[in-house]
Amino acid sequence: MASVAVDPQPSVVTRVVNLPLVSSTYDLMSSAYLSTKDQYPYLKSVCEMAENGVKTITSVAMTSALPIIQKLEPQIAVANTYACKGLDRIEERLPILNQPSTQIVANAKGAVTGAKDAVTTTVTGAKDSVASTITGVMDKTKGAVTGSVEKTKSVVSGSINTVLGSRMMQLVSSGVENALTKSELLVEQYLPLTEEELEKEAKKVEGFDLVQKPSYYVRLGSLSTKLHSRAYQQALSRVKEAKQKSQQTISQLHSTVHLIEFARKNVYSANQKIQDAQDKLYLSWVEWKRSIGYDDTDESHCAEHIESRTLAIARNLTQQLQTTCHTLLSNIQGVPQNIQDQAKHMGVMAGDIYSVFRNAASFKEVSDSLLTSSKGQLQKMKESLDDVMDYLVNNTPLNWLVGPFYPQLTESQNAQDQGAEMDKSSQETQRSEHKTH
């Protein structure tokens, strides 16, 4: 004998929500909410941010509570069965629950209109009596509808309160509390207090009164605001740091290029000028060696060594500049495309400057035209840095405020990997130059 499949018992919450009276009322409220959002753009952006926050915390809560719900599934099924039986009896006593709100109002209006027409056609001389009859019918109809709605609200409210008061919901609430607390701790750990928040904390006076713990919604809103603000400040500080490093490298490259030009222009004019150029280049070499951790001041002071060392400085600085440009690009994801194109073009120009010095063994192999174009590219890079920084200071990228903070994580990670590889090659170049000289 073939077994008969038994449909699973529907959830009481699902049945209550699917009642025509409840669902139609919800549709009316939803349409009013959407209409209000469309009419007021500023209110729409705030509502969308709140919806995203609620979706996030709901997802975290459901993930945390899922193991608990699975353990209590038999008890939940029994409670759901009793609740469904009670809802069946309520639906039998109140057929109005299975009618949408628009139909209830239309039926009431139809009954009133029919009564009015019948009285008007049969009793033309008793207007006052007809009016009082119509008023009584309307009051009774309105009272019946109101009473049905109140009973429905009472049933739904009682069912919700019963569910919320159950041990299962208490465990779910505890899971939400733990998830929210852990999220707050993670924000404090990975996104430290900003200077403004530190000043506010310093101005607070510690008291002995107990502070009431805020609700979930207040804590969720505070956490969202705190996360956006601190993430923006951290991203901005990274960009400022990249700009500062780039400007320092550009300044050092300017000085190195000027020294090379000076040596090239005066190498055949007079021995004294040659000696002056060599002295300046040697001092630049010593200063750069000290900046990277070496203090070998007893090295040879001959012209050939000075030239090779100066070219090594130029190669190292251009590699640093390329790395810094990749770091800057990885930290400005989400800004307009023209700003990202400027940052990418800076990396291209840094690569062009590096190609000028990469294979040069002496100053003779670096032409005046290449030095002139390198100086022009360095000046353009400095201007592009100023433009990017001015934009970020005066125009906060929207995704830095409402998330995600790194919408192109793959590109960002690739840029950082390229920067790390260039750092490694730069260090190897430094070691090889040190061993050679």
UniProtKB/Swiss-Prot annotation:
Q: Name one GO cellular component term.
A: lipid droplet
Q: Does the keyword Membrane apply?
A: yes
One GO BP on record is: long-chain fatty acid transport
Q: Which domain of life is it from?
A: Eukaryota
Where is the sequence biased in composition, kind Basic and acidic residues? Answer: 421-437
**Which PANTHER family does its entry note?**
PERILIPIN, PERILIPIN-2
Instruction: List N-acetylalanine occurrences by residue.
Output: 2
Q: Does the keyword section mention 4Fe-4S? A: no
Could you identify this protein by its name? Perilipin-2
Which of UniProt's keywords are assigned here?
A: Acetylation, Lipid droplet, Lipoprotein, Membrane, Phosphoprotein, Ubl conjugation
Q: Where in the cell is it found?
A: Membrane; Lipid droplet
